[in-house]
Structure formats: C-alpha cells, structure tokens
Amino acid sequence: MKSKLKLHGFNNLTKTLSFNIYDICYAETPQDQQAYVEYINSVYDAERLTRILTDVVDIIGANILNIARQDYDPQGASVTILISEQPVTPTESQIEESPGPLPETILAHLDKSHITVHTYPEIHPVDGIATFRVDIDVSTCGVISPLKALNYLIHKFESDIVTVDYRVRGFTRDVEGKKHFIDHEINSIQNYLSEDTRNGYQMTDVNVYQENLFHTKMLLKQFELDNYLFGDATSNLSPEQREQVTAKVKHEMLEIFYGRNVAV
C-alpha cells in the first residue's frame, strides 16, 4: 500500500469537478412545452437542489459554512454552498444574543471550497425538443476529493448526456520542501465511475496529463422513446410520428454530445 505524502503545512491544492448534465424530452404542443418548463421548475427548484448539494457535502466529507439559493422568474434556479474541510467552530457572534446577518451579507466571506448549481430549461421554438441543463461545480481545497460525488450526481439527475471536467491547480510542499502539483493518481475520470454507470454510457476522454486536466463526455446508450415524451405526445403519436420524433431526439443528443451542429 502506498504511504501517505507527508506535507509541510496545509494542503494548498485546489480540485475542481465541473458537470454539464442534460436531460432531453419532446413536448408536442405549446401547452405541453410550457407545462414541461413548469414541471422542471417545480421538480428542480432551489429547495430540492439544496437538498441534493447537501447530500454531496456529506458524500465528500465536508462541512457546510453557508447556503445561498434563488429561484428565478420565469425559469431556472441556483444554489451556492460554501464548505470547509474541518468542522466549523462557532464564533462569538454566532452564539451571542444578537441579530443574525442579512441575506445580502451571507456570502461576504467567500471560501475557496464551494459547490454551485444552476439550471437552464430550454425549448426549441419549432421542433418541440426540450432540453434541461444543469451546471454543477464542486471545488475543494485540501485533501477532500470532489470525485466522490460523481456517481451520485449522474444518477440523481437521470442524465442523458454528461460532460465532466476535473482539474487540479496550485501546489503543496512535502516536509523536504519539494512541490507536488497533484496528490493522487488519476488516469481518467472514468476510473471513478461505478461499473453500472460505465456500462450505461458511451464515453470519450480528452485528457491533458501534464496540465492535470481531465475531460470525459458521456452519452446514454439505451434509448426508449417513451422515456423522452412529455404531455400529449405520450399517447397521441402515430408510428410514423414516433419514428420522426425518435430521429429528432437522437439528433439533438448527438449534437450536444459532440458540441457542434450536425447535418441531418
């Protein structure tokens, strides 16, 4: 077993895991499209996103400093959680009998370690293809690894397409003064995914090892059209229409996966 690296002082490495998670569906009528946006806004509102991120904090073994969250009109939500590696000791101002901070001041002492999430519901103006995007950033400073949150987040959002970026920045020193620009072995983000996740997705890596930069794209392998239909489309489509919608949805997924417009 490899021995732990002895450090001089605090571990100053910053590890950041960034997700772009996409969920695709087809909503045939304008009424269904509006209903889809309202559904997403209710299912993934700021309160539920806070619960999900709180679970992430527990998974990576961190401690919550502060939470700020917001639902947006007409659509979308965001949550920011500041975290620390060590348990937080209450300050005198926190335990004395005095008014607490105003909402506007809650993020005044921004910490290096944080988790953020933003949601972006979107609908094609003509084709009825609806895309729900979730952007998540987990940034930690010290020995805490954000990679522990991978499987949980991918499954929690029932992801069709996922792009994941992981980078390590800064350096820390050992007791002899030697710099270390990464404190763990990693060849691919895929190594941190469970077997069922790896089997369920088509995956592509683009890694720049010398820069401690790792990138993985994921596309769900199994396609069942009924899982992508919303509203009237779940029962009103003819076999020919189902075939057309299947082509539209798959085309949308491929464009997002490859990150460019693809000719039909």
UniProtKB/Swiss-Prot annotation:
Pfam families: AdoMet_dc
Protein's name in the database: S-adenosylmethionine decarboxylase proenzyme
Known EC number: 4.1.1.50
Catalytic activity: S-adenosyl-L-methionine + H(+) = S-adenosyl 3-(methylsulfanyl)propylamine + CO2
GO molecular function: adenosylmethionine decarboxylase activity
Entry-linked InterPro entries: AdoMetDC_fam_prok, S-AdoMet_deCO2ase_bac, S-AdoMet_deCO2ase_core
Signal peptide boundaries: none
Subunit structure: Heterooctamer of four alpha and four beta chains arranged as a tetramer of alpha/beta heterodimers.
Active-site residues (renumbered): S113, H118, C141
Known function: Catalyzes the decarboxylation of S-adenosylmethionine to S-adenosylmethioninamine (dcAdoMet), the propylamine donor required for the synthesis of the polyamines spermine and spermidine from the diamine putrescine.
Residues with Pyruvic acid (Ser) modification: S113
Site residues (Cleavage (non-hydrolytic)), renumbered to this chain: K112, S113
Family the UniProt entry places it in: Belongs to the prokaryotic AdoMetDC family. Type 2 subfamily.
Top-level class of the enzyme under EC nomenclature: lyase
Co-factor binding comment: Binds 1 pyruvoyl group covalently per subunit.
One term under GO cellular component: cytosol
Keyword Lyase: yes
Classification via SUPFAM superfamilies: S-adenosylmethionine decarboxylase
GO BP, sorted A to Z: spermidine biosynthetic process
Keywords: Autocatalytic cleavage, Decarboxylase, Lyase, Polyamine biosynthesis, Pyruvate, S-adenosyl-L-methionine, Schiff base, Spermidine biosynthesis, Zymogen
Pathways per UniProt: Amine and polyamine biosynthesis; S-adenosylmethioninamine biosynthesis; S-adenosylmethioninamine from S-adenosyl-L-methionine: step 1/1
PTM note: Is synthesized initially as an inactive proenzyme. Formation of the active enzyme involves a self-maturation process in which the active site pyruvoyl group is generated from an internal serine residue via an autocatalytic post-translational modification. Two non-identical subunits are generated from the proenzyme in this reaction, and the pyruvate is formed at the N-terminus of the alpha chain, which is derived from the carboxyl end of the proenzyme.
Essential cofactor(s): pyruvate
